C-alpha cells in the first residue's frame, strides 16, 4: 500500500485529490502540508490522514523530510495566482520556488514517485509568462531524478473555486454548457477537477507499481485525453 504526501490540498484539484486518496483502499496513509486545514480533514479518519498547517512555508520542506514512514508518492497540486501573490514575480517565487523545494525534499527523503499537476501548454520556451513558469517547474523537477515522475497537463479546470476568478468562471460556464450538449466538446480543452484528481491518483499508483506506458518509464506525461481516460469512475 502507498503512503502519500500532498501539497495543494486546499485548492480545487488538490481537495479532490485528497478525497480520492482517502477513499482509495490502495493508500495506507496521507500527509498534507498546507497553509490552512483542508476541508476534507473534518470527516477524514485520523488513522489515515495527518495534516500539518503553517503559514510559514519555509517550514514545509523540513516537515516533509521528517515524515515517518517516508512517502512513497509525493503529489503537488500547489499553485497560486498573480493577484494573490501581488504580481507575477512574486507568483513565480512562490509557485516555482516552493514546488521545486518540496520536490527536492521528497527526493532526498527517498520518495519514489512524484506527481505534478501542471498545465496545458507548459513549456520553458513559451512566449507567455504562466506556461513558461509551468514548463520551468516541470523541467526542474524532472532533473531531480525521481524513480518515476508523473506530470498531468489539464486544460481549463472545471469546478467550483473558493476564490473569485470572474473571467475563468465565465469560461468554465461555457465549458459546462458545451459538455451538456456533448461531452467531447468540452473534454478536449477542459476537464473537471474531480476527473483530474482521479487521474493523478490512479497514475501515481500505477507508476509506483511500474505499470506505465512504454517509453514513459522515467517521465509519464498525461494530457487531456489521458486525463479523461485515467480519471473515469471505476
From Swiss-Prot:
It is found in: Mitochondrion outer membrane. Residues 1-28 form a transit peptide. Coiled coil: none annotated. Signal peptide: none annotated. InterPro entries: NAD(P)-bd_dom, NAD(P)-bd_dom_sf. GO terms for cellular component: mitochondrial outer membrane. It is a peripheral membrane protein. Keywords: Membrane, Mitochondrion, Mitochondrion outer membrane, Transit peptide. It comes from the Eukaryota. One of its GO terms (biological process) is import into nucleus. Belongs to the FMP52 family. This is Protein fmp52, mitochondrial. The gene is fmp52.
Amino acid at each position: 500500500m502507498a503512503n502519500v504526501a500532498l501539497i495543494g490540498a486546499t485548492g480545487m484539484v488538490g481537495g479532490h485529490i485528497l478525497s480520492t486518496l482517502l477513499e482509495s483502499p490502495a493508500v495506507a496513509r496521507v500527509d498534507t502540508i498546507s497553509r490552512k486545514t483542508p476541508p476534507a480533514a473534518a470527516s477524514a479518519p485520523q488513522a489515515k490522514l495527518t495534516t500539518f498547517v503553517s503559514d510559514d512555508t519555509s517550514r514545509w520542506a523540513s516537515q516533509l523530510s521528517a515524515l515517518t514512514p517516508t512517502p512513497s508518492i509525493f503529489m503537488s497540486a500547489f499553485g497560486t495566482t498573480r493577484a494573490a501573490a501581488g504580481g507575477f514575480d512574486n507568483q513565480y517565487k512562490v509557485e516555482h520556488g516552493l514546488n521545486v523545494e518540496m520536490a527536492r525534499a521528497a527526493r532526498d527523503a527517498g520518495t519514489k514517485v512524484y506527481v505534478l499537476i501542471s498545465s496545458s501548454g507548459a513549456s520553458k520556451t513559451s512566449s507567455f509568462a504562466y506556461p513558461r513558469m509551468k514548463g520551468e517547474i516541470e523541467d526542474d523537477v524532472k532533473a531531480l531524478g525521481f524513480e518515476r515522475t508523473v506530470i498531468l497537463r489539464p486544460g481549463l479546470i472545471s469546478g467550483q473555486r473558493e476564490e473569485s476568478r470572474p473571467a475563468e468562471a465565465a469560461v468554465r460556464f461555457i465549458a459546462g454548457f458545451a459538455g451538456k450538449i456533448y461531452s467531447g466538446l468540452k473534454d478536449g480543452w477542459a476537464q473537471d477537477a474531480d476527473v483530474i484528481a482521479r487521474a493523478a491518483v490512479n497514475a501515481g499508483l500505477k507508476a509506483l507499481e511500474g505499470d506505465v506506458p512504454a517509453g514513459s518509464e522515467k517521465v509519464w506525461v498525461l494530457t487531456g485525453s489521458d486525463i479523461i481516460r485515467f480519471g473515469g469512475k471505476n
